[in-house]
């Protein structure tokens, strides 16, 4: 796709919008998901403003270990990561989010180098707000914010950003895809990488089922609010008429697929209307809408995925419990 959508410049800040009409895409994705035999919604639509705030609250719960564990690994390994990445000064981050962990990277890279170019990529317009905050916190940082789906952004990066560069994919966000999707995205990343590029990727490891399920069913019910908020997001943006009181949050570990699944279960027979569609979307009592996966990795699976994607692990860092891993990989 052409970079024709929107480009704006400020001092040390550039915005590149490669997205199609966000509302049209949202509408198409929702209609497709609710029309499927097994209903689903895409997890990228969790993150409106309220959803992003709720996710930040989830990260503060006692049960949700991934964020604090990855952050602790990052703090302990940062000198090693800097050494490993050599003279790289271009950092491309997929799914920047609130950039809390990213700040650890940026702060330390800016201590080592006078100039750093940072390319955060996300489909959400909230990324613009996050980028502006980073610009205030790190005035020397050159920020090129890319509003886009990952695949389009990777094409842009491959064409416009010279090697060497560091791709960053934290939070085990790669695990939100189906296994085939994980493989496909890793292959796309590998294709976007040059021989001197590197990628720092966070991967959540398979562990005790009770620990996993507690992380996605916190006692305060914040994860439930986060899950239900996707329906509110549809109501707000697409003029849907979901009644959130008629759904309950349900998440569990699917051993066969090695993943946590999050669902919204209909508590009664009901019909939902989305503005722009004459069709009513019907749900039976007990029927669920699958909203998210969170794949949990093993060393064997990681090795297979990297090999099949043309990637090679250079180094890894883990916490003492081996709950989570950070891995530096290169192209084969």
PLM region descriptions:
Residues 106-152:
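Class I SAM-dependent methyltransferase SAM/SAH-binding core
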Residues 38-85:
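Class I SAM-dependent methyltransferase Rossmann-like catalytic core
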Residues 213-295, 299, 303-309:
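Substrate-binding/catalytic lobe of Class I Rossmann-like enzymes that use SAM or dcSAM, i.e.
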Residues 264-267, 318-332:
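Core SAM-dependent methyltransferase catalytic element
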Residues 1-44, 52:
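N-terminal auxiliary segments of SAM/dcSAM-dependent transferases
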Residues 192-206:
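Conserved beta-strand signature within the Rossmann-like core of class I S-adenosyl-L-methionine
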Residues 88-97:
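Conserved class I S-adenosyl-L-methionine
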Residues 183-195:
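A short glycine-rich, Lys/Arg-flanked "PGG" loop and its adjoining helix->strand segment in the class I
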